[in-house]
Amino acid sequence: GEGHLTALDVDAIEMAKTEERLRNQGFGPDILTVRKINFANIDEVAEKDGKFDFILADLGVSSMQIDNPDRGFSYKYDGPLDLRLDQTKGEPASERLKHVTRDEFEGMLIENSDEPYAAEIASVVMQELKKGHPVDTTSKLRELIEKALVRVPAADRKEAVKKSCARTFQALRIDVNSEFEVLETFLQKLPDVLNPGGRVAVLTFHSGEDRLVKKSFKENVKAGIYSEAAKDVIRPSAEECRCNS
């Protein structure tokens, strides 16, 4: 018989667009349910809709979110330094920065994105905040990252700044949205929401997510909860990367 797709997201803005697109393609209420809920609460969804035969978790952010300047996900566009996936909850990144110490911010950059210039970036950003100057736009944060990397040789600086900007925005986004904690909660609840013989696939974007997923799957195979876990990751082809760039 026909399956039923339950789609979860915390981003009401993108969720509405995606639902409209799917409905226009013929996905009616009989085969598609859309819920605004964090996948950390997948147990609540399973209680309402029943357990799942297959779960696909697509982590991180989409190009639609990144390309919207009002969301503040990208250093490439000027906009408010927000970075929240759900703009109805929590505090934006600009507020979060006011409530962390230099050491905490440095730790965040190292743990969430392996930023090699974490100490320099944290120092410059915190100096700016101590002066009473707000760091509330994406362009302002980018400007401070450029300042922090002033000692990088001129020939390498442009590329280094670009990479450090991407890593810094990633680290802040992970922190603002508690992404690692949310992922760990989701992974812990998975065995209880899957039907016997159910399968799970997780699309990870960076090593921090990848480590958590591998650890959880490995532990559950060892405990006899999962029958097996893929030994190798499936990487996107060059063609897929080109289409998504």
Kindly give the residue locations of the regions a language model identified:
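S-adenosyl-L-methionine-dependent methyltransferase catalytic core, i.e., the SAM/SAH-binding region
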Residues: 1-245
